[in-house]
């Protein structure tokens, strides 16, 4: 499927194909072909756009929630796991331009790449279609997901959930420790490995392309291992 046919499904008639090619071009592809562009600059813009429009959506659709809860929902919505799931649902992986190495390791299925591409493509739509086209795109992708009745339950804050569990048991010795930082040149990102330690013992491990994401995943792993409330 080409770019034009892909966007026809969303009633978007593209004007500048080049901006979409840029949004779908991974660093590995650009390096192999000595291109002067990849999706990274558009990813930067797309991240800011999603922060803004997700904030507006939450503000107007969840009028009873306070600032803290809105912030939690926004963070959960724009995190890698959520965006990559949407990218998979719309079959975005088939459009990504990857280098040979990334193709061999199925880079089109990697959460980090799928999330980045969704951000970059969102920026491309905004540049090419302005706000009207952007809203058409978001309504059929991200906002559709956010309108699901289970949305609030799905976007969990595992760190807060773990903290509440420990507080209920009057336990406070909780620490998140960065165990490893691995830099990936092709993606220009650092993969963090974080452990959750309770009373000096490791109870969970998580990875992510930000410290916050790694901590959330570590907390989730910890919660899954705590089959029953902690006791003194």
Swiss-Prot record:
What EC class is this?
hydrolase
| The reaction(s) this protein catalyses | Endonucleolytic cleavage to 5'-phosphomonoester
> Taking every annotated instance into account, which residue ranges of this chain make up the domain DRBM?
157-228
Named from the GO MF annotations, one term is: rRNA binding
Which biological process terms from the Gene Ontology are attached to this UniProt entry? mRNA processing; rRNA processing; tRNA processing
Q: Which GO terms describe its cellular component?
A: cytoplasm
The UniProt entry, under NCBIfam families, shows: RNaseIII
Q: Family, per the entry? A: Belongs to the ribonuclease III family.
Q: Which HAMAP family match?
A: RNase_III (MF_00104)
Q: What is this protein called?
A: Ribonuclease 3
Q: Which organism is it from?
A: Mycoplasma capricolum subsp. capricolum (strain California kid / ATCC 27343 / NCTC 10154)
């Amino acid at each position: 499927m080409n770019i034009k046919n892909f966007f026809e499904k969303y009633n978007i008639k593209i004007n500048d194909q080049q901006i979409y090619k840029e949004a779908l071009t991974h660093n590995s592809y650009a390096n192999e072909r000595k291109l002067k562009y990849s999706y990274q600059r558009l990813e930067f813009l797309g991240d800011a756009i999603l922060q803004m429009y997700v904030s507006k959506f939450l503000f107007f659709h969840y009028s009873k929630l306070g600032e803290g809860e809105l912030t939690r929902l926004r963070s959960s919505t724009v995190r890698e796991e959520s965006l990559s799931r949407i990218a998979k649902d719309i079959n975005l992986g088939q459009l990504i331009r990857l280098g040979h190495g990334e193709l061999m390791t199925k880079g089109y299925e990697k959460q980090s790449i799928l999330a980045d591409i969704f951000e970059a493509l969102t920026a491309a739509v905004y540049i090419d279609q302005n706000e009207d086209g952007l809203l058409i795109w978001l309504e059929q992708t991200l906002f559709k997901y956010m309108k699901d009745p289970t949305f609030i339950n799905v976007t969990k804050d595992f760190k807060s959930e773990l903290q509440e569990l420990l507080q209920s048991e009057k336990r406070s010795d909780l620490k998140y420790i960065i165990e490893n930082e691995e830099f990936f040149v092709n993606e220009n990102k650092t993969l963090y490995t974080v452990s959750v330690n309770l009373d000096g013992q490791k109870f969970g491990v998580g990875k992510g392309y930000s410290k916050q994401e790694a901590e959330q995943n570590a907390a989730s792993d910890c919660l899954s291992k705590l089959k029953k409330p902690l006791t003194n």
